[in-house]
Design a protein with these regions (language model features):
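Small/polar glycine-rich anion-binding or flexible loop at a beta-alpha turn
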Residues: 107, 127-134
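Conserved beta-strand/loop scaffold segments within soluble protein domains that form the structured core
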Residues: 1-119, 137-161
Length: 161
């Protein structure tokens, strides 16, 4: 790709019991004024392990380029795990680069709040997870977003109780 090229990667990984899901992305800037973004979301439950491996490289002639990386993990229980392995290689000094990573756990308070409004625990958990992946789902065509929500709900079956 040449000058002013743009790239975007969106990924969702779901790690259930006995699973280790490893997602990742690579963005390589080789020309000036290029832009890229990576957004990765992972969900782990039942002792599942979710990982993200990402690489961003900005070559010496890729002046005035920009990249953002955002990795978010949601742990549904206390026995699941998430790991992030970013690799950043910048070979020029007039670029913008941002990297954020968060790991959060579904809290008892979140569940209590929704359940106190009459929602069953399994539906409350599913709503929290759907809210977590919503930033990616809204970027997808409607039929893919619906399929993603169905897959998440299938993966969440049996997560409560």
């Amino acid at each position: 790709m040449g000058e002013h090229a743009k790239g975007e990667t969106l990924s969702v990984a779901f790690a259930g019991p006995g699973q280790h899901q490893d997602a990742g992305a690579k963005m390589i800037h080789m020309a000036p004024h290029t832009q890229s973004s990576i957004v990765s979301k992972s969900i782990a439950r039942g002792g599942g392990r979710a990982g993200y491996r990402g690489e961003v490289r900005i070559d010496a002639n890729a002046h005035h380029s920009a990249n953002t990386v955002r990795c978010d993990a949601l742990l549904v229980d206390t026995i699941s795990r998430s790991d992030t392995y970013p690799a950043i290689d910048i070979r020029v000094d007039d670029v913008q680069l941002g990297h954020e990573a968060t790991v959060s756990r579904v809290s008892e308070e979140q569940l209590f709040y929704l359940m106190s409004r009459g929602m069953p625990e399994d539906e409350a958990m599913a709503m929290i997870v759907r809210g977590f992946i919503e930033p990616i789902a809204r970027e997808l065509p409607m039929e893919y977003a619906m399929e993603l929500n169905k897959l998440i709900e299938m993966g969440m079956e049996g997560s409560v109780g």
